[in-house]
Amino acid sequence: MAKESMKAREVKRAKLVAKFATKRAELKATISNVNSSDEERWDAVLKLQQLPRDSARTRQQNRCRITGRPHGFLRKFGLSRIKLREAAMRGEVPGLKKASW
């Protein structure tokens, strides 16, 4: 189980990403726009640097909904491999069954 503080930190990051997503996208569009002047681009770079670090999407880490485990995470289910296996063995995941060949 991950510490509660780690789970809370990820929730905080998710809120920051949502809050600054449009502003970050606008600044990145200005920076990558070929028709923008060098001064506009430079201003956009400086403004982008002023945004909080945790507002970047890449700072977020996928975590298991149950345990908060960051590794072995399966996006399709939102669970770690361990908790997914436990749920599948109990028959709680529709359409998922143990492989045998």
From Swiss-Prot:
Stored Gene3D superfamilies: 1.10.287.1480
SUPFAM superfamilies attached to this UniProt entry: Glucocorticoid receptor-like (DNA-binding domain)
Entry's Gene Ontology cellular component terms: cytoplasm; small ribosomal subunit
Quaternary context: Part of the 30S ribosomal subunit. Contacts proteins S3 and S10.
Keyword Ribosomal protein: yes
Any single biological process term in GO: translation
UniProt GO MF annotations: rRNA binding; structural constituent of ribosome
Organism name: Pseudoalteromonas atlantica (strain T6c / ATCC BAA-1087)
Record function comment: Binds 16S rRNA, required for the assembly of 30S particles and may also be responsible for determining the conformation of the 16S rRNA at the A site.
Family under the similarity heading: Belongs to the universal ribosomal protein uS14 family.
Name of the protein: Small ribosomal subunit protein uS14
NCBIfam families on file: PRK08881.1
Record's keyword terms, sorted: Ribonucleoprotein, Ribosomal protein, RNA-binding, rRNA-binding
